[in-house]
Regions:
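RNase H-like nuclease fold core
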Residues: 1-53, 57, 61-70, 85, ...
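RNase H catalytic domain
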Residues: 14-21, 57-140, 144, 149
Length: 163
């Protein structure tokens, strides 16, 4: 049995205003069997979105960039994303038909569902890191996310619904 390649995906999301212009940053890191380190950075900015949507988009973009099944460690400063999986919020939402415990529709259900699709070919675990505390990759992802949010060519977040 062949072991899955291991990829670390570091992510961060940002929004100016919440809602406001936003962006995500993502670093994919893979050490190949010869010991060569491969790294790729991804980012994009959106006209009107929220920080939580951008946190989700960072993970989605990283997973969707992978070309074959991998063991993936997602490293994020977003408790929203990490706790949703590690504390099984997502499983509960699915059982309740994408409703919260208080029977409200789950926010960002479109992106949660897209994230679940992106996870399917992979074995994924989620790890939380404290943001803005000198974690090199988290700081880089934050810089990518804020630069994307401040960029000139912002995309439309078609799933964003103002409250």
């Amino acid at each position: 049995m062949q072991l899955l390649p291991h990829v670390d995906i570091f992510t961060d999301g940002s929004s100016r205003g919440n809602p406001g212009p936003g962006g995500y940053g993502c670093i994919l890191r893979y050490l190949d069997p010869t010991g060569l380190l491969h790294e790729r950075e991804l980012s994009a900015g959106y006209r009107l979105t929220t920080n939580n949507r951008m946190e989700l988009m960072g993970v989605i973009a990283g997973l969707e960039a992978l070309r074959k099944p991998c063991h993936v460690s997602v490293i994020s400063d977003s408790q929203y994303v990490v706790k949703a999986f590690n504390e099984e919020w997502v499983s509960a939402w699915i059982k309740r038909g994408w409703k919260t415990a208080s029977k409200e529709p789950v926010k960002n259900a479109d992106l949660w569902q897209r994230l679940l699709q992106a996870m399917k070919p992979h074995k994924v675990d989620f790890r939380w890191v404290r943001g803005h505390m000198g974690h090199e990759e988290n700081e880089r992802c934050d810089a990518l996310a804020t630069a994307a949010a401040d960029g000139l060519e912002l995309l439309e977040d078609t799933g964003f619904v103002p409250e």
